[in-house]
Amino acid sequence: MSIIVERLLSRESAYGDAVEDFPLRPQTLRQYIGQNKAKHNLEVFIEAAKMREETLDHVLLYGPPGLGKTTLANIIANEMGVNVKTTSGPAIGRPGDLAAVLTALQPGDVLFIDEIHRLHRSIEEVLYPAMEDFCLDIVIGKGPSARSVRLDLPPFTLVGATTRAGALSAPLRDRFGVLSRVEYYTVDQLSAIVERTAEVFEVEIDSLAALEIARRARGTPRIANRLLRRVRDFAQVRGNGTVTMEITQMALELLQVDKLGLDHIDHKLLLGIIEKFRGGPVGLETVSAPIGEESHTIEDVYEPYLLQIGFLQRTPRGRIVTPLAYEHFGMEIPKV
C-alpha cells in the first residue's frame, strides 16, 4: 500500500473526512472562518446579484487542497437560495456526461465542478457556450448528414475548484467572472475551527489544546479536524474525555506529528537528504529511491509544506535542505 494513502497529514480528502466533515461545514459566509478577502468579495458579489435578481457570475476557486473550496461552493448556493449540483472533472468523461448534468439544472442552480483542471479539452468546448450564452450545442448524426442542434439552458452559476489554476486553458479561465484564491489559515483561525469542531462533536477541549492542534495542522482545516478526531480518541480511551494539553501532546507524539506539523515521512525525506547527500543539492529522482515514493508524489504531496516553512529549497542543481531544518533536528550545519 502506498504511504500517501495512510498519511494522517495529507491535505487530500479521505473517506472518513467526507463522512464526518459534512456536519462541520458552515452554511453561511458569516459562519465561515478565515479567507477574509475571498469571503468579503463574495458577500458583495452575491448581494449585488440578488439585488438585480440575476444569477451570480461564474466563480473559480483555486488554491491548495483542504482549504475550504467545496465548502465555499455550497455556501454560495445557500446564500443565493438555490440548489447545488456537484461533480468533478474526472467524473465527466464524455461530452454527453456534461450535457446530462447541464440539462438537469434548474434556473439559478449552482453547478460545482471540483478538479475542473482535469476536464478534457473536448468537454471544455461544450462548456464554453453553456457558460457564455446558457445554451448547449449538440451534434446529431454522423458524417455528411450530421447537424447541430442548439438547446437553451436555464441561467446557472458554474463554480469551479482547482489546485492547479495554471493547468486550466486560457479560454476556460477567461470565462469566469469571479476568481478567488484560497489561502493557508493562521494558527488563530485554525484554533477557532478546532474549537467549533469540538463543539459539534460535543467534546470538551482546552483552549491551549486547540492551539496546539492548530500549530501542527499545516495551515489546513482538513488536517486540523482530522488531528482533533484522533486526539479525541486518545482523550476518551486514555483520559476522561476532555481534550487537554497533556492528552494532545501525548497523542500527537504517538501519532508522530511534531511541533511544526512534520510527520515521519517528512523526517525521512529531510534526514535522507542530510545524511546521504550532505544536505544537497540532490536530484529529485535520487531522493525518491530512499523513501520508496515516485518523484511526482514527492513534488506534489510532500514538498509543498517543506517549501512553505523554508526547510527545503528547489534549485537548478536539485533539492537543498536549509539551515532551518538542521536547527529543527538539532543538527550541526555542515561547513562548505
Curated annotation (Swiss-Prot):
Enzyme Commission number(s): 3.6.4.-
Ligand binding (Mg(2+)): 70
PANTHER family hit by this protein: HOLLIDAY JUNCTION BRANCH MIGRATION COMPLEX SUBUNIT RUVB (PTHR42848:SF1), PTHR42848
Binding-site positions, DNA: 314, 319
Function (record text): The RuvA-RuvB-RuvC complex processes Holliday junction (HJ) DNA during genetic recombination and DNA repair, while the RuvA-RuvB complex plays an important role in the rescue of blocked DNA replication forks via replication fork reversal (RFR). RuvA specifically binds to HJ cruciform DNA, conferring on it an open structure. The RuvB hexamer acts as an ATP-dependent pump, pulling dsDNA into and through the RuvAB complex. RuvB forms 2 homohexamers on either side of HJ DNA bound by 1 or 2 RuvA tetramers; 4 subunits per hexamer contact DNA at a time.
DNA repair as UniProt keyword: yes
GO CC, any one term: cytoplasm
Coiled-coil portions: none
Main location: cytoplasm
Entry comment, domain topic: Has 3 domains, the large (RuvB-L) and small ATPase (RuvB-S) domains and the C-terminal head (RuvB-H) domain. The head domain binds DNA, while the ATPase domains jointly bind ATP, ADP or are empty depending on the state of the subunit in the translocation cycle. During a single DNA translocation step the structure of each domain remains the same, but their relative positions change.
Stretch list, region Head domain (RuvB-H): 259-336
Record-given protein name: Holliday junction branch migration complex subunit RuvB
Region (Large ATPase domain (RuvB-L)) residue spans: 1-185
Locations listed in the record: Cytoplasm
Keyword NAD: no
Record field: catalytic activity: ATP + H2O = ADP + phosphate + H(+)
UniProt gene name: ruvB
